[in-house]
A protein has these predicted regions:
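Catalytic machinery of carbohydrate-active enzymes
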Residues: 1-289
Length: 289
């Protein structure tokens, strides 16, 4: 790989896609948002890192090159699959981005950790600029579940968080993305019956495009899923992400953004065990007008 890289004399811009748990659409949408930034106006090579082999990065890069709406010039595309040992086994809470940067440096590839911070450089500053328009109709997005049972809030937690937020400010509107079990639970059914004008359930047939669009208009997002968390950073929306810090949701893949609060339980346990007060404490950091 190092020999191939040194032979590419015309390569000037490298875009690193930290793609763990991210859908193709989220990566594509983030690239669209980068189009106006001069230093990334031309991307020569996109590097992708992901331990999940089923994702077709060649298809993604072809799609990137073919989509004229992105506004980026991709003069060359290559896929480097670098074998990176699971950082959870090395140092449990060291961010995976650090390992990626060290691996690149060992290959003679210059990059920086700032390129790994949630896909969008300076997203924090942009998020602050957008807060005025978001507060005109303040909506909070509660994503109730992830890809495994340990990464799922209980219906009781969701309902309790929602009721506390509704009581805090009469202008707050809540959207809850619930799985089938949560959606039919007595707690959420009663919540929606009690607050029909202020709480809505996100439709179950929604796509990742719909999800990202909904997140982009919110003042804060709560999620136990790292894919949704990185999507929120790409959408430049403040977020609270809850980790169980076990095999399927290691904190080493957390978003790197100063408008992302990461919560951990006191011990490795399902997210459904996290106290509601701790969740609310994280959310309320972003509820200051």
């Amino acid at each position: 790989m190092a020999e191939y890289w040194s032979a590419c004399e015309n390569i000037q811009n490298v875009f690193v896609v930290p793609s763990r748990d991210l859908s193709m659409f989220v990566r594509l949408r983030a690239l669209r948002r980068l189009a106006g930034q001069a230093e990334l106006a031309n991307i020569d090579v996109a590097l992708s890192f992901d331990p999940i082999p089923m994702i077709d990065y060649f298809a993604f890069l072809h799609w990137l090159q073919a989509d004229a709406t992105i506004g980026l010039s991709v003069t060359q595309y290559s896929l480097f699959r670098i074998s990176i040992p699971d950082p959870v086994l090395e140092v449990p809470r060291r961010h995976a981005g650090e390992r990626i940067v060290r691996t690149l440096a060992a290959l003679g590839i210059a990059t920086g950790l700032d390129q790994l911070k949630g896909l969008v450089p300076r997203s924090s500053e942009v998020a602050m600029q957008r807060r005025g328009e978001q507060w005109a109709r303040p909506r909070i997005f509660l994503n109730g579940f992830g890809a495994s049972t340990t990464r799922t809030f209980s219906a009781t937690q969701l309902a309790a968080v929602a009721r506390e937020l509704i009581a805090q400010d009469s202008t707050f509107q809540l959207t809850i993305n619930a799985n089938a079990e949560q959606r039919t639970s007595p707690e959420l059914r009663q919540l929606c019956a009690d607050q029909p004008s202020r709480v809505q359930l996100f439709r179950p047939d929604a796509t990742i495009c719909d999800l990202l669009d909904a997140i982009a208009g919110c003042i804060v997002v709560l999620t136990p899923d790292t894919g949704v968390a990185h999507g929120a950073v790409a959408a430049r929306t403040p977020l609270v992400v809850v980790f169980d810090d076990v095999e399927y949701n290691p904190i080493c893949w957390r978003p790197l953004d100063r408008h992302a609060v990461c919560l951990l339980p006191e011990r490795p346990e399902p997210i459904s065990c996290m106290p509601v007060d701790k969740i609310l404490e994280g959310i309320r950091q972003f509820l200051v007008r």
